[in-house]
């Protein structure tokens, strides 16, 4: 423990090296590894194990925030699970260290309820952060500034209750708006990411430094943190993201095969057997169309492993016929047409292991890679 005025030179050096993320999340270790709030995958146990290993673990909070929604019940259950896993069940007033919640804002019918239904759950369970993503641009444009359910109103309400706010973006334009709305952390997600994302964007190699430069230039009055997401699966990718200007690194696909994740076995198998992600994953609106998922605005699409349904689509099979095959396969237990969200780094993922081990391995790999780079530059 650090006491002002009683620190050694070594301790003073360590303190000087702390980043803004470290100050907000004192249990984190550098480089900061963050597990993404993947819907139906990122549960409380997974988040807790990431936190215990010195990372930041996010629990998926869903997208339906209307009173009585099953998403609300599941969120409360998973946060209680995280508290239990962290050994804090008998300390209900202690904040959950290194734990956050992810909320999808594209369901315009339910976003006005966030502060009425989600916020009380967050206050009760005390995660440290909230990650927002996919606000509907039409809803934002048609609403009065700060109206209920807008990003700005939600961020202000979260700040008033003491939460650090992450906001996921895919363009510099959206990063600017998120920062103007008050976000503390910009999650700069590149198009190599798995799952939902901006339909039009770039990879983190250009996105992260341009977002960082914009924030330094236009938001000088406060420090807005940037973390990178998309296409990272090992320590080499972590170092690359840090070199681009990120203060922390988000991984999604790597954690889908963590032992603690809620990923079904057939999807784990798909992830572990897929390689050459640039060829064998596809970024498209088709994945939501075949799933009949209608809540997503068309500015968002998603990246998933190429499968029989997509191959038929690419070959020109009419959607009605393709969807019939999709439903018949699902009803017969054939998962070859099911959507498995995945990023392009899927080919780097070779095994299933505990989430804490993944975090520690990423951190050590990154440190070793940094040493090698320093040797090259000497």
UniProtKB/Swiss-Prot annotation:
Cofactor or coenzyme needed: FMN
GO BP of this protein: response to xenobiotic stimulus
EC number of the protein: 1.13.12.16
Top-level lineage group: Eukaryota
A GO MF label: nitronate monooxygenase activity
Disulphide bridges, residue numbers: none
Propeptide stretches in the record: 1-15
Record: residues binding FMN: 37-39, 229-231, 252-253
Active site positions, chain numbering: 196
Subunit structure: Homodimer.
Protein's name in the database: Nitronate monooxygenase
Organism: Neurospora crassa (strain ATCC 24698 / 74-OR23-1A / CBS 708.71 / DSM 1257 / FGSC 987)
UniProt lineage: Eukaryota, Fungi, Dikarya, Ascomycota, Pezizomycotina
The gene coding this protein: ncd-2
């Amino acid at each position: 423990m650090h006491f002002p005025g009683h620190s050694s030179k070594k301790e003073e050096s360590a303190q000087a090296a702390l980043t803004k993320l470290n100050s907000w999340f004192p249990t984190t270790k550098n480089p900061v590894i963050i597990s993404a709030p993947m819907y139906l995958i990122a549960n409380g146990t997974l988040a807790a194990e990431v936190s215990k290993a010195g990372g930041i673990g996010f629990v998926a909070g869903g997208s339906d925030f209307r009173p009585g929604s099953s998403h609300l019940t599941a969120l409360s259950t998973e946060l209680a699970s995280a508290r239990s896993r962290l050994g804090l069940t008998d300390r209900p007033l202690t904040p959950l260290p290194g734990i956050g919640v992810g909320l999808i804002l594209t369901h315009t019918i339910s976003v006005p309820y966030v502060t009425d239904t989600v916020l009380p759950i967050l206050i009760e369970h005390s995660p440290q952060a909230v990650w927002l993503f996919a606000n509907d641009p039409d809803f934002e444009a048609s609403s009065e500034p700060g109206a209920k359910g807008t990003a700005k109103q939600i961020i202000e309400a979260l700040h008033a209750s003491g939460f650090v706010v992450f906001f996921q973006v895919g363009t510099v334009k959206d990063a600017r708006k998120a920062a103007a709305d008050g976000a503390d952390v910009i999650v700069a997600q590149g198009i190599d990411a798995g799952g939902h994302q901006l339909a039009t964007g770039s990879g983190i190699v250009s996105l992260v430094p341009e977002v960082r430069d914009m924030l330094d230039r236009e938001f000088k009055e406060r420090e807005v943190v940037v973390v990178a997401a998309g296409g990272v699966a090992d320590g080499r990718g972590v170092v690359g993201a840090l070199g681009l200007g990120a203060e922390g690194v988000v991984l999604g696909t790597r954690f889908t095969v963590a032992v603690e994740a809620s990923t079904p076995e057939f999807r784990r198998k798909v992830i572990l057997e897929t390689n050459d992600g640039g060829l064998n994953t596809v970024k498209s609106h088709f994945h939501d169309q075949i799933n009949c998922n209608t809540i997503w605005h068309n500015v968002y699409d998603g990246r998933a492993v190429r499968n029989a349904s997509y191959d038929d689509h690419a070959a020109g099979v009419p959607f009605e016929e393709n969807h019939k095959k999709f439903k018949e396969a699902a009803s017969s237990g054939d998962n070859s047409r099911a959507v498995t969200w995945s990023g392009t780094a899927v080919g780097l993922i070779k095994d299933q292991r505990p989430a804490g081990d993944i975090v520690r391995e990423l951190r050590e790999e990154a440190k070793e890679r940094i040493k090698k780079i320093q040797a090259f530059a000497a």
